[in-house]
Design a protein with these regions (language model features):
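A conserved active-site cap/scaffold subdomain adjacent to cofactor or substrate pockets
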Residues: 1-11
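Conserved C-terminal structural/oligomerization subdomain of aldehyde/semialdehyde dehydrogenase
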Residues: 14-144
Length: 144
């Protein structure tokens, strides 16, 4: 954790250039692989090989473990994107982009890392933490 991809690769006995920024490990069809089951806080990405989009969505549901936080898909098929978004039912769902796009980094939304996303309230903004007030006037200022 917290190491460059090249440092991690060399520790594993793999020779890569210093400019290497990402390591992709092919875990084939093993959804029980430690890299598939554990959040990676390093530049190592597991590659799972599903037979089709339905199996990939099924695996994503298993691996997300019902946390309802974040999921995403890269696809040109809008039906597949819709199918996965509905199945995952996460607070943040990103189509064809990095997951940080859901927090305003190249996408839409606000950059707010709070506990609100997995509990269903969604992302927060400054307005989430202030008292909203309503002012109402009766009779006067009625312009017809």
């Amino acid at each position: 954790m917290g190491r460059d991809a090249a440092v991690i690769a060399r520790a594993a006995g793999i020779d890569v250039p210093d400019s290497c920024r990402l390591l992709i490990i092919d875990v084939k069809r093993d959804i029980d692989h430690v890299f598939a089951r554990t959040e990676q806080l390093m530049p190592v990405v597991p590659l799972l090989r599903a037979k089709d989009v339905d199996e990939a969505i099924e695996w994503a549901l298993i691996l997300e473990r019902g946390l309802s936080h974040t999921a995403g898909i890269h696809s040109r098929n809008i039906d597949n994107m819709d199918k996965m978004a509905r199945a995952m039912n996460t607070s943040l769902f990103v189509k064809n982009g990095p997951h940080l796009a859901a927090l305003g980094a190249g996408g839409e939304g606000w950059t707010t890392m709070t506990i609100s996303t997995p509990t269903g309230e969604g992302v927060t903004c400054a307005r989430s933490f202030v008292r909203l007030r309503r002012c109402c006037v009766v009779d006067n200022f009625r312009i017809v």
